[in-house]
Amino acid sequence: MSKKPKYKTALIGTGRIGFTLGFDRKREQPASHTMALRKNRRIKFVAACDNNQLRLDHFRRFVKKTITFADCSNMFATDKFDIIVIAVNENSHLDVTLDAIRAKPKLIILEKPVALCVADALKIQEEAEKYKIPILVNHERRFAQDYKIAKKYIDSIGELISVNARLDSGLRVYTPSEENSGAYSLLHDGTHLVDIVSYLLEEENDLSDLESKILYNMKLNNIVFDKEKSDVVRFVSASFESLKCPNVNINISGKSKFFGFEIDVIGTLGRIRIGNGIFEFYKREESKLYSGFYSLEKDLKVKRPKKTKYFSNMVKNAVDFLDGKAELKSNLQTGINTLRILEDIKNQLKNELL
């Protein structure tokens, strides 16, 4: 049997998601691109780039066999890579991704969100199609075992009545002054919330149609502005429809004193609650409280996975794709669809600020 090839890989960005989250002892590991790449035996991690010398020095002390660069163009000029991973800040996605596409790797892994705005994302798409470069977008929950279980279980809870998704943090939801940086939660973490709701509601073969947003007919329900800064949004609630569910609610708080991420899916025969630290599945059973009624009871047959493998499964999907064994589970088009939904919300917020 011939030996399977290793894919030569380069990383751009050695910050939190690129590198340092791999040292967070409370997080499920691997939690960074560096750790996930190093864990996969089919990856040959040969180069890394960062324009911050302190970060690069820290990275070099840990990953000693990887050649480091302060400039992407120099890195691209020295070698030909199978995979290029882009883990830079949102405001650098467009330029860095265009440069990476022109370096002609076999695959690009791009951190979420695709770009600051849909217009930038479409420029990336146009260049990717020109050079025929596939792009995997790291909306990590699409690769997580717990969400895979939830997606499969949805078919057993009957007709969907409602989906309520919530993100809580202390980061502003939106302000026009940060639009060029992406430093607001609607984009930064809201992309995870909207994307995973889309994942749960989309069909398995629904990944190819760019114009097909899973959520549509948006209505803004409530907005709360900062008490001192009138151009800062601290809370937004928006409702949507989808083919699978007529009532989808997205709530994002930027005034919470904690970080929370959860989704509550209610059907005619059951319920799913899933999120950070949450894994609950309910099914319809004869009621223990009332004669002639049914209640929802926890489905004890559904076991929480010991590890979700969200990051390692993402890298595995990249390898399987290059091997010709699998399609990308989170591609450029699903990423753009998510960005379109976020932009719908953002544009409504901008109208309210006028």
Task: Pin down the residues of each PLM region.
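Acidic-histidine catalytic/liganding microenvironments
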Residues: 40, 63, 78-79, 144, ...
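NAD(P)-dinucleotide binding in Rossmann-like oxidoreductases
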Residues: 243-314
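A contiguous active-site-proximal alpha/beta segment in oxidoreductase catalytic domains
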Residues: 115-176
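Short active-site oxyanion
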Residues: 43-47, 82-84, 184
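C-terminal helix-rich "cap/oligomerization" subdomain common to oxidoreductases
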Residues: 1-6, 83-85, 316-354
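Beta-loop-alpha module in the N-terminal Rossmann-like domain of NAD(P)-dependent dehydrogenases
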Residues: 54, 63-127
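Rossmann-like dinucleotide-binding domain that binds NAD(P)(H)
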Residues: 173-258, 333
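N-terminal Rossmann-like dinucleotide-binding module
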Residues: 1-62
